[in-house]
Structure formats: C-alpha cells, structure tokens
C-alpha cells in the first residue's frame, strides 16, 4: 500500500489510495489486487520499522496507512495550513521518507484526537467496534503506550508489566487513570483505520475486484502476541528456511516457532481468530511462507 502514493496522499500510499487503485484495476480489467501486510510494525519509530513482515500485532493496522483527510479537519487554521504545506513537501520527495511521514502523521493524530476524540469514543460506532475487538485492541494499545514510555519494544526489559497480567492491564485502561488518554489514542486511530480499510473493501466488492491480503507466518518476538500469549510460541527457537537456489546459506527470519501441541488443545483458536479478522477486510489471503 505504501507504494500507491498519489497527489492526495500524505507522503506515502494509504487506505484512501486503495480506492484509486481499485478504479485503475476496473479500467484495466483486472480482478485481483494483492497487497503486502498492513499491520503495525512500529518498534523504534525509525526507518528500520518499515519491514512489513515484522509486526507488533497480528490485528492492528499501521497508523501510517490512515488517510488523514478521511479522519477529519483541524479547526485550528494555522495548524491545518502547516499540515497542508508538509503534505506537499513529503509528496514531492522522490522516495518515501518513512520517519518524517510517521512523525508528521502522529502530530496530526494527536491534534485531531484532542479536538474530536471524546466525541468519537462516545459514539455508538466506536463502542460497537471496541466491544468486538477489545480482546486484542486493549493489549495492543497498552503495549504501544509502554513501548514508547520505556523506549523499547522488548517487554522483557520493561521495569513494570514485563509479564502480562490481564487484571493489571484492565485497570490501566479505565477512563479515570492518567494512562487512559495515551491508551485511548490508539483505540481512536485503529477505529479510523478499520473504517477506512472496510470502506475500501466494500468499494472493491461493489466493483467486482478481490482484495487479497498477506499473512506473515511468523510473529515478532517483541510483539503483543509474544507478550500476552507466550504459551503459543517456542520463544527460544527461530524460524527460517533451508538453503536453496535463492539463498545458498538459507535464511534465518528470527521469528519464534509455534507450539503446535498447545495450539491443538484449544482447536487452533489463535489461528481461527486471526483468519476471521482478516476475512473482515479481504476475500482472499496468502499465508507467507506456506
């Protein structure tokens, strides 16, 4: 999606550009658009986070893909003018400036959240989204908040909450806590991303185009899932591929392997939930590398 940058983008292709890609597919008589993973890969806020196969969540989308024009308009005219100028600057670059794009979009998210956040979080649409996605959304939001607070995605190094405790996390997420404004910002962004990708999906279906997603077979060892569900993984192992014509030394992807015996005991619930979530947005998907 990042490569779909258009004149309406903010320095990088976004979910709004997907609709323009669908229009092109219709004009050129194409039936399927396959995209790379669009999950959040934010580890350090550096350009090294741009690798789409090392996500911090199997559910959350990367905030970078939010079409800020769909999100809303800033009432502060001076701030709005500043972002319009920045959009033109970032769009004029010959290559995507990953760090600048993300930093600028986050500045926008914070301002718009202060302006619109309470109203959106009180809406029926958001409440329905939250209840349907709370199981993954709440841990993801807290993980992201603590990652930035402790300046590392390696939860083992966090001075507090290094071992996931659902009750403690639930307490942090109560609206009266000092943590809540920081945590709920992630709810707000994920809600907008959900609406935007769902809109693109419905648009594709209306035009007879299949959106095909991509599921990385592995998870990051510094991810929400490794933090909240370590029993599903062999965190002392590393997945990869043996030598072949493309890599004479083989490949070490660094991802932990799955504990299939544990997964089998609950009927592969972890995978079922993952596939069901993907099916909300995609009519087909690839499991890479299977």
For each feature predicted by the language model, list its residue ranges:
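Active-site beta-loop-alpha junctions enriched in small/polar residues
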Residues: 2, 38-40, 216-220, 290
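Alpha-amylase-like alpha-glycosidases and glucanotransferases acting on alpha-linked glucans and related
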Residues: 7, 45-195, 218-290
């Amino acid at each position: 999606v990042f490569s779909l940058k258009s004149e309406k983008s903010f320095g990088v292709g976004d979910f709004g550009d997907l609709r323009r890609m669908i229009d092109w597919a219709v004009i050129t008589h194409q039936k399927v658009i396959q995209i790379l993973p669009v999950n959040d890969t934010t580890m350090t806020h550096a350009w090294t986070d741009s690798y789409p196969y090392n996500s911090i969540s199997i559910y959350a989308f990367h905030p970078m893909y939010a079409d800020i024009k769909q999100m809303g308009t800033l009432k502060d005219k001076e701030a709005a003018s500043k972002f319009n100028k920045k959009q033109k600057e970032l769009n004029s670059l010959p290559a995507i400036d990953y760090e600048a794009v993300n930093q600028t979009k986050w500045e926008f998210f914070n301002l718009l959240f202060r302006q619109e956040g309470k109203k959106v979080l009180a809406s029926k649409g958001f409440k329905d989204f939250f209840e349907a996605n709370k199981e993954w959304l709440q841990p993801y939001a807290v993980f992201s908040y603590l990652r930035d607070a402790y300046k590392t995605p390696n939860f083992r190094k966090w001075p507090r909450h290094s071992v996931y405790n659902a009750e403690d996390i639930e307490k942090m997420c109560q609206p009266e806590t000092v943590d809540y404004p920081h945590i709920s910002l992630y709810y707000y962004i994920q809600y907008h991303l959900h609406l935007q990708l769902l809109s693109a999906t419905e648009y594709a279906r209306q035009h007879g185009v299949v959106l095909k997603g991509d599921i990385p077979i592995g998870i990051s060892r510094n991810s929400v899932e490794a933090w909240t569900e370590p029993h599903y993984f062999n965190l002392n192992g590393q997945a990869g591929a043996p030598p072949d014509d493309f890599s004479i030394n083989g490949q070490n992807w660094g991802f932990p392997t799955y504990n299939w015996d544990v997964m089998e005991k609950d009927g592969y619930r972890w995978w079922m939930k993952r596939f069901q979530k993907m099916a909300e947005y995609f009519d087909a998907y690839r499991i890479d590398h299977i």
